[in-house]
């Protein structure tokens, strides 16, 4: 510690800056996915993307992310966006990306931060002191500041648990978050749209017991024409994959806050699930009824 400037959460992690814009660009990321490919191909364990766009998904972009995460074992971390609204931006909303929203110092959602069901975690992003050009420092606000804090946390996790692969390290970051929905802030309006909560790096590097069960390949069907209308009974089937430590008494329950849906009693109790195992509820799918009068 030389007492100058700032320090990264990713203490002693090496970093590789990747240029992803043209010389003439001032605010545009022109070749972001080329940069992701380059970073993965050059052995980066964590790739931070403090950039993104609105609109729909692209299979090409998802393929580049899968190349980085699944083929080259790099954790992809991306800023959720600064729209102050509920929306899915890209790359943060892609599969296999850790989407990071921003919080303020009291754990409330930062006013500028995008929120969405696709968000995975939050990190501080309001008035973050950082380096800038010409050997100076300044404070910035944005999910672009929150994302590298989360990425640095992943660097710590991968240093602490070197046997973890990319998906496991990302899940370790997620499951060790602090719950910020029940704190004395205004986050209740964003329930489940700020991910698991605000990252806690101490827990992330000390928790050696928690499992990490994720839902994969969720499908919804009415066992008819799959045109959902009031009165239909929907069936939800999924795979449940345990990325981390074994469970002893796993219980999966379907819930909703919507008054237009009635959940039928259906709790899936797989019990013990070993690390790396995948199970399904195909034989006992979750069920829910779309109530009469529901606008569709």
Question: Each predicted region: which residue ranges?
Answer:
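Subtilisin-like peptidase catalytic core
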Residues: 1-57, 67, 101-104, 160-166, ...
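Active-site-adjacent substrate-recognition loops and nearby beta-strands
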Residues: 6, 27-32, 56, 78-119, ...
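Hydrolase catalytic cores
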Residues: 9, 16-22, 45-46, 74, ...
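Catalytic-core regions built around general acid/base machinery
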Residues: 57-76, 96
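Low-complexity, acidic Ser/Thr/Pro/Gly-rich terminal tails and inter-domain linkers that flank the onset
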Residues: 206-231
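Short beta-strand elements of extracellular/lumenal beta-sandwich folds
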Residues: 230-245
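Short acidic, flexible loop segments centered on an aromatic residue
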Residues: 241-268
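Intrinsically disordered, low-complexity Pro/Gly/Ser/Thr-rich segments with frequent PxxP/GP/PP motifs
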Residues: 262-294
């Amino acid at each position: 510690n030389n007492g100058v400037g700032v320090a990264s959460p990713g203490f002693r992690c090496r970093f590789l800056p990747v240029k992803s814009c043209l010389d003439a660009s001032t605010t545009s990321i022109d070749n972001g996915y080329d940069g992701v490919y380059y970073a993965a191909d050059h052995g980066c364990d964590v790739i931070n993307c403090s950039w993104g766009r609105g609109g729909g998904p692209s299979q090409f972009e998802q393929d580049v992310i899968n190349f980085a995460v699944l083929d080259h074992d790099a954790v992809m971390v991306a800023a959720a966006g600064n729209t102050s609204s509920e929306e899915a931006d890209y790359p943060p909303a892609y599969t296999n990306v850790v989407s990071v929203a921003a919080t303020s110092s009291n754990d409330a959602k930062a006013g500028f931060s995008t929120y969405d069901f696709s968000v995975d975690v939050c990190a501080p992003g309001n008035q973050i002191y950082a380096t800038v050009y010409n050997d100076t420092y300044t404070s910035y606000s944005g999910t672009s500041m929150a994302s590298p804090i989360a990425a640095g946390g992943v660097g710590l996790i991968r240093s602490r648990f070197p046997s973890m692969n990319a998906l496991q390290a990302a899940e370790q970051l997620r499951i060790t978050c602090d719950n910020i929905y029940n704190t004395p802030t205004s986050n209740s309006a964003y329930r489940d749209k700020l991910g698991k909560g605000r990252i806690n790096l101490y827990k992330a590097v000390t928790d050696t017991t928690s499992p990490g069960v994720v839902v994969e390949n969720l499908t919804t069907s009415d066992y008819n024409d799959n045109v959902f209308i009031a009165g239909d009974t929907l069936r939800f089937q999924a795979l449940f994959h345990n990325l981390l430590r074994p469970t002893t008494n796993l219980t999966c329950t379907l819930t909703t806050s919507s008054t237009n849906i009635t959940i039928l009693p259906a709790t899936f109790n797989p019990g013990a699930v070993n690390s790396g195992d995948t199970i399904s509820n195909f034989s006992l799918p979750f069920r829910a009824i779309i109530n009469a009068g529901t606008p569709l």
